[in-house]
């Protein structure tokens, strides 16, 4: 499997990258870590004539706090996410999820922006970003705009990004101190996409669930924010009847493909299993 021929560009600034993408139009694709784009180029599912490599743009790298948000540059690697003490304290679910992406070699190159941006339903960050209520900063020829992660994904590899735009940063509201969290992922082997996965972030008070948010990975042609499933957990002790209702609501919105990871019915049920496990672990971690 060999990609088609292409011209290679390596801009030094966001402005230069946007100018290149605008000039080259639909024949160009931005290149982050390459672990989503290069495989589909090898199979000729993507045949860009130009690659715009973003790795020399320092403004796309870094983790900082702005008000009540954590802001992560799009070219920040998964390895850097795992090693960040700041994220471990503020958003530990990002570290937990990053550790389940591929393998250490890929995590040294793979970026949070690349994982989130291109609309691959098998990637782990999109559903997590929806669960966390994140927003994407998109920068293009008309300047920067903000799009909620829950509004960004339109279909497999189809997103709200416009021609000439780049995902430059991800803004994530910091959950309350003492929140519970978990990312549960079923996969066939190290490095594989999820058969099904679930992200859960919740808060507890007096033994009752106060807030709950759920994201589901690779069980539809987009990541899924299971809003209704989260709502039925609120006000409960997260006991079995409440979990049964949440699982049923989450399973009802899935539409996985039957593939080498299993038939659609199996993958739907595994989404429910992953959700149940994630809620139970998140509950155990939450402080009342």
From Swiss-Prot:
Alphabetical list of SMART domains matching this protein: CO_deh_flav_C (SM01092)
Origin, by domain of life?
Bacteria
- PROSITE patterns associated with the record: FAD_PCMH
Q: What GO annotations for molecular function exist for this entry?
A: carbon-monoxide oxygenase activity; FAD binding
The record's free-text note on cofactor binding: Binds 1 FAD per subunit.
Q: What is its EC number?
A: 1.2.5.3
The cofactor required is: FAD
Q: Which reaction does it catalyse?
A: CO + a quinone + H2O = a quinol + CO2
Quick one: which residues bind FAD? 32-36, 111-115
Give all residue intervals belonging to the FAD-binding PCMH-type domain. Answer: 1-177
Signal peptide annotation:
none
Q: Which UniProt keywords apply?
A: FAD, Flavoprotein, Oxidoreductase, Plasmid
Q: Do you know which InterPro entries this protein is assigned to? A: CO_DH_flav_C, CO_DH_flav_C_dom_sf, Diverse_Substr_Oxidored, FAD-bd_PCMH, FAD-bd_PCMH-like_sf, FAD-bd_PCMH_sub1, FAD-bd_PCMH_sub2, Mopterin_DH_FAD-bd
Q: What class of enzyme is it?
A: oxidoreductase
Q: What does this protein do?
A: Catalyzes the oxidation of carbon monoxide to carbon dioxide.
Summary of subunit composition and partner proteins = Dimer of heterotrimers. Each heterotrimer consists of a large, a medium and a small subunit.
The protein's name is: Carbon monoxide dehydrogenase medium chain
Give the species. Answer: Afipia carboxidovorans (strain ATCC 49405 / DSM 1227 / KCTC 32145 / OM5) (Oligotropha carboxidovorans)
């Amino acid at each position: 499997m060999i990609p088609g021929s292409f011209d290679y560009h390596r801009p030094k600034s966001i402005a230069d990258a946007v100018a290149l993408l605008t000039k080259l139009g639909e024949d160009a694709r931005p290149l982050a870590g390459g672990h989503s784009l290069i495989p589909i180029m090898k199979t000729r599912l993507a045949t860009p004539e130009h690659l715009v490599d973003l790795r020399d743009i320092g403004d796309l790298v870094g983790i900082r706090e702005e008000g009540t948000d954590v802001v992560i540059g799009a070219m920040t690697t998964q390895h850097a996410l795992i090693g960040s003490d700041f994220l471990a304290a503020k958003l530990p679910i990002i570290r937990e999820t990053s550790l389940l992406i591929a393998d250490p070699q890929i995590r040294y190159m793979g970026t949070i922006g690349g994982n989130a941006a291109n609309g691959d339903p098998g990637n782990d960050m999109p559903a997590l970003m929806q669960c966390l209520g994140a927003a994407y900063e998109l920068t293009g020829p008309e300047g920067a705009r903000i799009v909620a992660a829950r509004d960004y994904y339109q279909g497999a590899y189809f997103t709200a990004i416009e021609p000439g735009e780049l995902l430059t940063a991800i803004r994530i509201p910091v959950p309350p101190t003492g929140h519970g969290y978990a990312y549960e992922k079923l996969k066939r082997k190290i490095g594989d996409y999820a058969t099904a996965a679930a992200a859960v972030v919740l808060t507890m008070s007096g033994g009752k669930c106060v807030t709950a948010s759920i994201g589901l990975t690779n069980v539809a042609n987009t990541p899924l924010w299971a809003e209704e499933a989260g709502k039925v957990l609120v006000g409960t002790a997260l006991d079995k009847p409440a979990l049964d209702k949440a699982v049923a609501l989450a399973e009802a919105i899935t539409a996985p493909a039957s593939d080498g990871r299993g038939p659609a019915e199996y993958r739907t049920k595994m989404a429910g299993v992953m959700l149940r496990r994630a809620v139970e672990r998140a509950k155990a971690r939450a402080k009342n």
